Amino acid sequence: MNPVSTSELAALFDCFIPNAGPASFEQLKGGHINLTYKVRLASGAQYILQAVNANVFPNVTGLMENVFRISAHLEKKLSTMDPDPNALRFLRFVPPARQSASLSDDKWYWRVYHFIDGVVTRTEAKSPAEAYTAAKAFGRFQSLLADLPEP
């Protein structure tokens, strides 16, 4: 997919957070599957606007149902634990405020989630310590999902 125009991105984002007045869109490069933009609002709030590639994920509806189910489970579970904002941060999706034909077609499905400040994406660990930290976080994530009910 070619980059999307600013006016198209603004219209898509408005389906999720109406009248937010996005200040800017920055395409995040490096991914090979989805098309991803960082959205900065004039208020300072930041979001990710992403087009999921339906050619790679043919059951996007099922994918998003699982994502919402896991997010809700983590939110509930973490709310009963000691408040430590750095303990585990995860994607918190923004459901569409209104449906639009432009949110999905046979190739792309658009979604929005809150930007997680201070997080970096890597394709490989830069050191054994970084690999250990990533593995430890993934293990914690898995343990938090151990009691996730079946759909």
Please give the residue ranges for each predicted region.
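Conserved ATP-binding subdomain of kinase catalytic cores across diverse folds
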Residues: 24-151
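Juxta-kinase regulatory segment immediately upstream of eukaryotic protein kinase catalytic domains
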Residues: 1-26
